[in-house]
Regions:
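C-terminal catalytic "cap/lid" subdomain
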Residues: 1-239
């Protein structure tokens, strides 16, 4: 078994990545493949917190643009993350793991209310903790929510599993000359306006000296490779 580099992680998975080619809803083949890798990490002794976006059901900014009040659209987006969290918790339990959903918004019939101490206790007990409902406030992305939870649980690293395999100098889908970076500093990402995540999330990570790893979820084994310190995607850290 490979040596573990990051003992406690916050893994952020985009909702779209779990939707597969349908781009909406959940592709349970993908969900189960991710669960198997999470199980591999947990079996290796990794304490794992998880944030899942809601874009496979609803994207507040995009789907609600010019159609509804922004805070209402964001509320729907937060509820979408709860749907994903419940589904993934169910899948994790079917794989033999103990999972808990902690929501930033109280909804006691569906999941527990988040507190930092509850999350820390569950992680120390070996449970997978899924953080739902973002920050509980509109105008903040799930990426920002993921960084916030990563800071709160004192994660060794925040792993951003997305549909792109790292951070590029430009959009690789538009610019064929775009170059992928192996490592960057937070200052470089912000100064170059690179599309790693939103500025709020990036600044929060920088201010709290977090290591951020951006990589593709296309091969879920990348999660375990990153945990073991392999060079996958792009690492963002301090100078």
């Amino acid at each position: 078994m490979s040596e573990i580099k990051y003992k406690r992680i916050l893994l952020k998975i985009s909702g779209e990545a779990l939707a597969g080619e349908a781009h909406r809803g959940l592709d349970f083949e993908i969900v189960n493949s991710v669960c198997r890798v999470i199980q591999k990490c947990v079996d290796a002794g990794v304490q794992l917190g998880l944030v899942i976006g809601g874009g496979n059901f609803w994207r507040g900014v995009k789907d609600g643009a010019d159609k509804m009040q922004r805070s209402h659209g964001d509320a729907m987006g937060m509820l979408a993350t709860v749907m994903n969290a419940i589904a993934v918790a169910d899948a994790l339990e079917k794989h033999g793991m103990d999972a808990r959903v902690l929501s930033a918004v109280e909804m006691n019939k569906f999941c527990e209310y988040f507190t930092r101490d509850t999350a820390d206790r569950y992680l120390n007990e070996g449970k997978v903790v899924i953080f739902a409902a973002g920050t509980g406030n509109p105008y903040f992305s799930t990426d920002t929510g993921a960084v916030l939870r990563g800071v709160e649980i004192e994660a060794d690293a925040i792993l951003m599993a997305k549909n792109v395999d790292g951070i590029y100098s430009a959009d690789p889908n538009v610019d064929p000359t775009a170059v992928k970076f192996d490592t960057l500093t937070y200052d470089e990402v912000l100064a170059r306006h690179l599309k790693a995540t939103d500025t709020t999330a990036m600044t929060l990570a920088m201010d709290n000296h977090m290591t951020l790893v951006c990589f593709a979820l296309k091969d879920p084994e990348n999660i375990y490779r990153v945990v073991c310190g392999q060079t996958i995607g792009t690492i963002v850290k301090e100078d």
